[in-house]
Amino acid sequence: MRINIEPDEHIVASLPKVWGNEVGLMGFFKKSKEGVLVLTNKNIIFVPRFVPLIPREREKFFGGDEAKVTVMDNYSESDLDEDISEQSSSLLLPLDSIANVENVESRKVNFLRIKCIFNGKTKTYDFGIAESVTNYPIRQPLRFHNVDWNAWIKLIKSYL
């Protein structure tokens, strides 16, 4: 039985090893998190979760400097629902609240920027793929890959 996602909701695309961060003043006080970015037919969901990948799997998801539209193997809707329940900092963005999806260049790196409207307030989130990460004192990205997000942007806009 699903608690956080609806019974008729299904995964359209998923991308592991994504770093998410809120843009603006509130983002300054929060650390960016590594997780899985999931597009369902009703929501965009970011679940903070470490997923180990071998180099061959990295090519499947973001090879050729492009964020590819694919689904993670062995990651179902029930797994997603369980991860959302376990991680209180999961981010659920209903597709009807999304105002804009775009590719933004910052520090010579492309990020996926999603703007949402909640209760009349606009919140902005950036998502990127880390090239190198530091593990001490906490796991944080040092550099990001310059990834083309156009395939994801087109897919998200087709569901809006």
Locate the predicted segments by residue.
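The phosphoinositide-binding surface of pleckstrin homology
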Residues: 2-31
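Acidic, Ser/Thr- and proline-rich intrinsically disordered linker/docking segments
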Residues: 32-34, 45-160
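Structural motif
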Residues: 40-41
